[in-house]
Amino acid sequence: MYFANANIHPQNEYEHRLETIQALASERAYPLIEGSYDTDAWEETAGRIGQELEELREGAGIANEVVDSPNPYPLPPKEDKGPHVAAAREKAAQLRRARCRACYRLRFEETAHYAAEHGFDAVGTTLSVSPFQYTDIIEEELLRACKKAGVNCAFTDYRPYFEDNERISKEMGIYRQNFCGCHFSDEEAQLERTIRKAARKAKKAALKAAKKEAAEKELLGSINENL
């Protein structure tokens, strides 16, 4: 196993995740290699695109919106704010994908290069287990990195096993993070949770109001019948 995660922020989060995989590797007698934790290289590539995205969102007044979330569970529809904002949303979606692509590329190239240098014939990734990732981009970038390094690409879409993965990790007491890794994804995950929580609260309030209205109508109808 090769741990290439220069995207993870802050450093104590990186260390927590590394210690988790080290414990599992030790328990299963799997060899584990820690890659480079070069956060400067990450910021110069994926981070630069992420900053451009944040500036666009601020300028377009959509900083409180979730942009192009790969989450399979739909969010509440966005308010129509006209063609200018619609164009900004489209550009923001492109930038978010580009940011994640740059992140995948940096880490896969590092991994594939190590594999080629140390006699491994193929590289795969566990990123594809998450339905909250851009699986299509992961496959494209893994294939690209492997071709560049001269090793085989062993991509597998593990999303069908996501629920099993969650269940087993919980049974084993393995730490599970609630965001991908970078500081942008941390903020996006928090925003998405806030929006979903507000939507659930609004739905619950609407159902309660509807039940109350129905009960009042039923009571009024009963009173009218007795007059």
Which residues does each predicted region cover?
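Nucleotide-activated chemistry modules centered on ATP-dependent adenylation/adenylyltransferase
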Residues: 1-227
